[in-house]
Regions:
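A domain-start/cap signature at the N-terminus of enzymes
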Residues: 6-47, 85, 116, 123, ...
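Gly/Ser-rich "nucleophile elbow"/oxyanion-hole loop immediately N-terminal to the catalytic nucleophile
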Residues: 38-43, 98-146
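The conserved beta1-alpha1 loop
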Residues: 51-53, 190
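Active-site machinery of serine-nucleophile hydrolases
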Residues: 54-117
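Alpha-helical scaffolding within the catalytic cores
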Residues: 68-78, 170-179, 200, 204
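Short, proline-enriched alpha-helix->beta-strand connector loops that line the catalytic pocket
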Residues: 83-85, 181-186
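C-terminal catalytic histidine-bearing segment of alpha/beta-hydrolase fold enzymes
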Residues: 169, 185-247
Length: 247
């Protein structure tokens, strides 16, 4: 995986466009986006909707890329050249979460949509519906880690027919409504030694979806703690699988 720092990191950040979404309901949220390297007229391209972890919160509109070196992973896996993908990533303010739940809880019921999720959905919808963007609405993917792993489960349970595939990393969802997720391709990841968010959260969701008739994928990495995203970043199989999915 590409490790970026100093000048190389800033050069990569500068390839993303920064924006602010002003919600019709009040308030705003920062987000960044990037286009595929090669755009051809009258052709559509996939989009990755990325949800950062707690370390990416703030107001600089860069933390969502620097958190867990996601920006390095996107570069290493050649999202913009090999996969010719769009990426859009919102930034949660310092005192908010993607999902308003206790990360240490054994389970939870899906709460009211958070301010950050609501506004980032609005920004995403506007981006997709903008005529100048060539987004393939049948190839919109979602991925998130830790706090963003919770956000990924939350997003697909709110919009089960919207995404073509999902990769929740060390998060947790509402297993009581797992039946909503039987049709969407999901590959969840967790470290079996995670002391921040129990691997049982991912395991329980995987089992609940299977009991409801779905066929999700789940990887539990032995000996890995909370930073299981490192395994995701380097998994060629995961990225190949993700970009092969279509709604």
């Amino acid at each position: 995986m590409v490790l970026l720092n100093g000048c190389s990191q800033q050069k990569e950040i500068d390839k993303y466009s920064s924006a602010v979404w002003n919600s019709p309901g009040g308030g705003s949220i920062n987000y960044v986006y990037r286009y595929p390297d090669k755009l051809k007229k009258d052709k559509k391209y996939p989009l990755l909707f990325f949800l950062h972890g707690s370390g990416g919160r703030g107001s600089d509109n860069q933390g969502q890329l620097l958190d867990a070196n996601s920006i390095g992973a996107f570069k290493s896996q050649r999202l913009f050249s090999k996969h010719n993908s769009y990426v859009l990533a919102g930034q949660v303010p310092e005192d908010e979460r993607w999902v308003d739940v206790d990360w240490a809880s054994k389970d939870h019921q899906m709460p009211k949509i958070s301010n950050s999720m609501k506004k980032t959905f609005e920004a995403l919808d506007t981006f997709i519906n903008d005529d100048k963007n060539q987004v393939d609405i049948d190839r919109i993917y979602i991925m998130g880690l830790s706090m963003g792993g919770y956000g990924t489960w939350d997003a697909i349970q709110r919009r089960p027919d919207f995404f073509a595939a999902a990769v929740p990393i060390c998060g947790g969802g509402d297993k009581s409504i797992a039946n909503l997720l039987t049709e969407i391709p999901i590959w969840s990841w967790h470290g079996d030694q995670d002391q921040v968010i129990s691997a049982a959260r991912s395991r329980d969701m995987d089992n609940a979806i299977k009991k409801s008739g779905g066929s999700p994928k789940y990887t539990e990495v032995k000996g890995r703690g909370h930073d299981v995203w490192l395994d995701v970043w380097e998994s060629e199989d995961l990225w190949k699988w993700l970009y092969s999915q279509s709604r």
